[in-house]
């Protein structure tokens, strides 16, 4: 109850639930150590990346990418910590994020402001990866093998008769409006990928490999997005082991 009161007070005084300063420091140190330079850039990644964010200032979606295509000559130079903080800026939980950087080749300084979590439109980013592979990298659809890891979904079984503003914004310690937006997008993308894979009715011959691992929480075992208690972390670990057990045969 104390934690819930603290969050409510922060919102009343126009503050997000959390301050990102310590998180940013830890992430920055980790990235710089791995890259061997400071600041570590997105291009220091050892694998291809497509990281979605939403630019509230311009009302536009961005996907920050590594330089895995000859035309991708800009975003790979972004400081990795700024990309991470941008896509982690979930509304209410963290303030929107802004940053600027200078390209390595000495080009014009780039500035971004009011960037928020890409999860509001790509909580399930599978379609981004699919499109990048097929359209940008020209990988044949039949060669695709996609593993999509969900963040969990919750059936709203405790619905009141009328869904009021209080229910959506802060009922039982949960910010349900954000849950709804991210879950709806994730479910839509998953259904769309199944359609691409097997066609109408999910009954056709698979065009490519697609596995979606998603856990359905009940009201008594749900873990909040900002719940980092040891009990909840252990519960999430157990869920991961159960999902692997259920899908191990198809994944291997």
Ranges and model annotations:
Residues 1-252:
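Conserved catalytic cores and adjacent C-terminal regulatory segments
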